[in-house]
Each structure stands twice: as C-alpha cells, then as structure tokens.
A protein has these predicted regions:
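ABC ATPase C-loop
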Residues: 151-152
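ABC-type ATPase nucleotide-binding domains, specifically the catalytic core motifs of the NBD
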Residues: 12, 68, 93-112, 123-125, ...
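Helix-to-loop junction immediately C-terminal to a conserved catalytic motif
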Residues: 48
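Conserved ABC ATPase signature
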Residues: 134-138, 142
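Conserved ABC transporter NBD signature motif
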Residues: 56-64, 76, 111-117, 219
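The feature captures the beta-strand-to-loop junction immediately N-terminal to the Walker
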Residues: 33-35
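Conserved catalytic motifs of ABC-family nucleotide-binding domains
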Residues: 155
Length: 237
C-alpha cells in the first residue's frame, strides 16, 4: 500500500532524514520507534505532504504521491493525527468531527457521515457524552481521542499517528492503544510513530527503529521487542 524509497528531508536547513526505505502493507499496523529527534515526526510530515522531501519517492496504492499537496493526500486516503493533538479548541466536539468529514459534508452526503459518527462514538463513548462541549475544555486524553476520531471521520485508507501517547497519563495511554489495537483488528492500515516503544511494539506487527534520521533496525514487532539492544535502548529493561 505505502512504499517509501530512499527518502531524504531537511528540517531548519539541516538534513534530518538520510535515505529511509520502508513499506506498510494494507491492513497492517507498522511502527516507527526511536528517541526524540530520531526523525519520526519529519517522516510523518513528508508522508502527509506538510514537508517536501529533498530526495526519494513516496508511492501510495501504486501512485507516486511525492509531490502531492496535503489536501490531495487526504483525498487519496492518507490522514494524519498530528503530534500534540491540535484540535480546534473554540469548536465543539461535534464540529471537530465534522471537520474530519468535510469532504463528504460539503456535497451534503449526511447519511454516510451519520454512520461515521456512530463508528467513532462506539470507539470513544466519552466523546458522545461531550458532543456539545468545546474541544479546548477537554482533558488531554479526551483531546487525543478526538484527534483520532476526527481523522477516522475522513475514512482513511492509511492512518498516520504521530506520538499519540505524548503528555498523557499511563492509564489514558493504555486506553488509547487498546483502541488502536481494536482498529488493527478491524483491518485499518496504520503507521505509528511513537516514543513509547513498549506500547508501539504491542500494537504493531512490524517495526522500524530510527536513529539520527536512519533506519538502523527492522523486523517484526515480536522480534524487536526481544532484541537486547532494543530493550536496553528503548524499553528500559
């Protein structure tokens, strides 16, 4: 589904990615793990169209999307849940969710969008209770739920998640990742960039370890979780 080949990118004038190559198959969750500054967010920005690579190709569903705009990538089926959540604070929960479905609300296909509301409220029942509440008044965990739900309202073919555990309490992180695993069981294709290596490897079926803008190790998630170097560097055991 997604194929990245020899991806290079610069951030603030310095090269941040040095030739990344990886794939995400349809219906699979893949994780990018590594310390802060490893290149995870830069990779996500390139994939979502927010940052233009300096070299390399990004292919999605057989089409070269390397130079497509963010809007064109959303239209193609790629949706990003950004680092830091970035909900629309002055808008209600429902209005935030409608923003995720704007491409279908604009032609007034409300019947299909209604089913999506039911889907995300089933995943995140707390949001149903807060549909009229301003997003800025939600807790950090509720805002992360909203950010994921908003992305799902676009019916993505590939869901990109950048550091979904950042700044959240451990119990909230546990709930968020339980929902991500549920999405994986439903066959939702996901690419997860995450510093919480333990949770990422429990959720994904395959992982890539990033360091200094390079992929330094790649294997199935179970193998990576058992690697001594990965445990020492990222799992704290």
């Amino acid at each position: 589904m997604l194929e990245v080949r020899d991806l290079h990118a610069a951030y603030e004038g310095k090269e941040a990615l040095h030739g990344l190559s990886f794939t995400v198959a349809q219906g699979v969750c893949v994780c990018l793990i590594g310390a802060n500054g490893a290149g995870k967010t830069t990779t996500m920005r390139c994939l979502s169209g927010l940052l233009r690579p300096t070299h390399g190709t990004i292919t999605f569903a057989g089409a070269n999307i390397t130079t497509l705009s963010p809007a064109a990538r959303v239209a193609a089926g790629i949706t990003l849940v950004p680092e830091g959540r970035r909900v629309f604070a002055p808008m209600t929960v429902r209005e935030n969710l409608e923003m995720g479905a704007y491409r279908r609300l604009w032609p007034r296909r409300h019947s299909t969008v209604a089913a999506d509301f039911d889907f995300v409220f089933d995943l995140f029942p707390r949001l149903r209770e807060r549909t009229g509440q301003l997003a800025g008044a939600l807790s950090g965990g509720e805002q992360q739920m909203l950010a994921i739900a908003r992305a799902l309202m676009s019916r993505p073919r590939l869901l990109l998640l950048d550091e979904p555990s950042m700044g959240l309490a451990p119990l909230v992180v546990k709930d968020i990742f339980a929902t991500l695993r549920r999405l994986g069981e439903m066959g939702v294709s996901m690419l997860l960039a995450e510093q919480n290596t333990r949770m990422a490897l429990r959720t994904a079926s395959r992982g890539y370890v990033l360091a200094g803008g390079l992929i330094v190790q790649a294997a199935d998630a179970t193998t990576l979780a058992g690697e001594r170097a990965v445990r020492d560097a990222y799992l704290g055991v």
